[in-house]
């Protein structure tokens, strides 16, 4: 069993408009996932400083940062970061450009989880529907172009309000799109903006939204998660 999660941390700024990294780190630790995709992990302008430093993450959580950043002060690429348990092997990683009018991107990491090599792709998509479709198409093309196919999980803030939206149809038909629940805004969730998409090698056993008291105030999004099995339920 693998537990994977996604969390738009809004640069560690909570619903009280205060930047409190220790609060965000508490939520990350509460989630207790094997892999966590973060969105808005870095500040948007200037040196793109991380709002959670690798030192803070190491001190306050059981995770380490996949080294995706191109700037010394950052932990991600266009705000997208991936955290994995300290004991986990990071086998490969890559930054992926996405078409858009504003700075957007996705990140990918191949990791070893419970004896399985798994590919994780994390994203934060455009607020404009046309660009969301193009971004998903581009992301899938880049993943399919890789020489080695692996069990794949895609996740993040898709900025898509409707479960039957055209943008979600850009994922292959044999992939499962999971909406764990309403995650935005965190105080009174109305929309399922955060989703988890899995290739056929995975079975989604359970999914949900992390709704702790701290999570309700730490960001404008609540984290989402899913328990995954590799292989069908009948596989011994």
Per-segment meaning from a language model:
Residues 1-35, 59-60, 64-236:
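Active-site regions of metal-assisted phosphoester/phosphodiester hydrolases
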Residues 12, 39-46:
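Active-site neighborhood of divalent metal-dependent phosphoester/pyrophosphate hydrolases
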Residues 45-54:
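Short, flexible, glycine-rich and Lys/Arg-enriched loop motifs at helix boundaries
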